[in-house]
Amino acid sequence: MRTMDNATLFAIIFVIAGASTLQFYKGRKLNLQLMQHYLRSIEEVVKPEDKDYVWLGGYIGFRAVYKVNRDNLRKFEYTLTLLPRHSLLYFPIALLTSRHDKIYFVIRPFAEIKREAHLIQKGYYRLKPNIENEEFLQRETIEIAGREYEALYEKKRDMVKLKKLVESLSKPHNVKHVSLTPKTNVFYVLMKPEPETIEKDVEKLVRFTNEKLRESPFSS
């Protein structure tokens, strides 16, 4: 009986080891393909004059910093974090904690952003992000593509411009947080990226920066 138990245990360990190895190679390949695709697609749209990449370790993503210095776009930065598809054990946990791949855009225009505005998808953050002077901002709930967003703003027209931007993207519900922050002069977008639509969405972010951030109410 003991010999049978040991044999069964060995078989289970062997199967898990084999599955882990297979998952590692398949998941690593997919994540590398995704990273390469996002990098090429975004770079093709932004066309930086200088670029810098920082590997985040393993196969979970990278950070990119682009110097653009064209039109209203001074710098275009983003951080891509992918689910650990190469890890059989950690991947299910990440699906519960991280939930999906993420891309964080930090866009720095030449024009000065004058007022604070945020759209935050309700229920997305487990811990609410710290927003400076939040108590002085107007607050309301709006709906975009069937999802509720908490809107925080100084002037309603700022929020309306952000709402129109989100609605114009390929899959608006993928946008989790979009904001304009005067203190850092940053236009920020957190979203779930999609390989099929990333190029079109980045084009719209660049167009918004070049056209809308130059106009009232943001820069005057």
Where are these regions (language model features)?
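Feature marks short, highly hydrophobic, charge-poor N-terminal signal-anchor/signal peptide-like helices
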Residues: 1-12
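Conserved structured core elements
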Residues: 12-16, 33-36
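Terminal, regulation- and interaction-focused segments at domain boundaries
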Residues: 17-27
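N-terminal topogenic membrane-targeting module
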Residues: 25-99
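Hydrophobic, Leu/Ile/Phe/Ala-enriched alpha-helical segments that form helix-helix packing faces
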Residues: 38, 42-50, 166-169, 209-217
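Short glycine-rich, low-complexity/disordered patches
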Residues: 48-59, 175-182, 218-220
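Structured extramembrane domains adjacent to transmembrane segments
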Residues: 73-199
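Long, compositionally biased interface segments
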Residues: 185-220
